[in-house]
């Protein structure tokens, strides 16, 4: 809801470097034009990235239930930025909703099949809403020393057909042509009209708060 293109988060680190370089000295008009010319493109490496959502057990008999840890296996991301600018040209993420699946070993294989079926069909309605997307609208960058940057990324998160503005704190490391972004944030299930799963005649149900975490690797193309 892996919420999970996420490689975009990492790009803000490069924006910070570009802004610092621009502030460091005057540039001629021709040089400025060259800086604003070609956009740098980074694409998410899904095989090396992780995007998970934790749902917590609640209700009067919450102690009889288990938390859920749902991971996405299919997601794509791309970020484009203009060197020397503090605003990327585009920053997007798309997660295939049907790829989200329970990962906790506390559940049996058969239980996971039931959970995943309910998640896909009733909770996310993946056939009707096949993608969960994030599109950036604003970003602020704070260098944290060395190749580490702390970023606040604002954008539109669309889940189950509902779009909400969401601010995500991210720690980004930039080394060579590779960007790595890590972070976590909370969303409310009710904000996106996501129904709660329940057991024991409704005495155990998923809480409203969901925690989204990610560890994203992206490479410059």
Where are these regions (language model features)?
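Positively charged n-region of N-terminal signal peptides that target proteins for export
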Residues: 1-5
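Low-complexity, acidic/polar, glycine-enriched regions of mature
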Residues: 21-221
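Bacterial N-terminal signal peptides
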Residues: 7-17
């Amino acid at each position: 809801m892996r919420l999970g293109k996420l490689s975009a988060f990492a790009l803000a680190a490069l924006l910070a470097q570009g802004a610092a370089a621009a502030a460091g000295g005057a540039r001629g008009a021709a040089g400025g034009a060259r800086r604003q010319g070609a956009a740098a493109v980074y694409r998410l490496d899904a095989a090396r990235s992780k995007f998970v959502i934790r749902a917590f057990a609640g209700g009067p008999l919450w102690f009889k239930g288990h938390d859920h840890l749902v991971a996405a296996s299919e997601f794509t991301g791309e970020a484009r930025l203009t060197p020397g600018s503090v605003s990327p040209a585009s920053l997007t993420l798309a997660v295939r909703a049907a790829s989200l699946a329970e990962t906790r070993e506390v559940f049996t294989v058969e239980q996971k099949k039931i959970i995943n079926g309910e998640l896909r069909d009733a909770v996310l309605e993946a056939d009707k809403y096949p993608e969960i997307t994030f599109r950036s609208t604003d970003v602020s960058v704070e260098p944290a020393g060395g190749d580490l940057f702390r970023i606040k990324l604002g954008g539109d998160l669309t889940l189950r057909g509902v779009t909400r503005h969401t601010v995500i704190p991210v720690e980004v490391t930039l080394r060579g042509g590779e960007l790595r972004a890590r972070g976590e944030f909370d969303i409310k299930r009710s904000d996106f009209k996501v129904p709660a799963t329940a057991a024991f005649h409704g005495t155990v149900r998923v809480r409203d708060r969901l925690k989204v975490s990610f560890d994203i690797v992206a490479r410059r193309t």
